[in-house]
Amino acid sequence: MKKRYRIKKSSEIDAVFKVRKFKGDSYFAIYQSDDLDADHFRFALSIGKKYGNAVSRNLAKRRIRMIVSEHSGIFIKSKLFVIVVKPLAQSLSYQEIKDKLIVLFKKSKIMENANE
């Protein structure tokens, strides 16, 4: 996943949180906002220290980045979103993470094609 698809500045992440438009479950929450000037979507990951040690947090971030990059062709171009990973997600396998995130992407209408 190229770095231009990531939200890096904390002010941009705070702006997404201020919109308060989100969907979530007991494992993840997705906050989103619109960026009409963008030619592609951008995202950020937030994972707290309660999730586990640095190794497990980095593994979760790598997995989620991979899931987003696999489905990057079907995200709406003008969206900014932040994926918040909750501590319960530590017990999930890669396939379970993928399934739950895709359901949340569809619920939050970030994907262009809901049939994917």
List PLM regions with ranges.
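Positively charged, solvent-exposed patches that mediate nucleic-acid binding
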Residues: 1-116
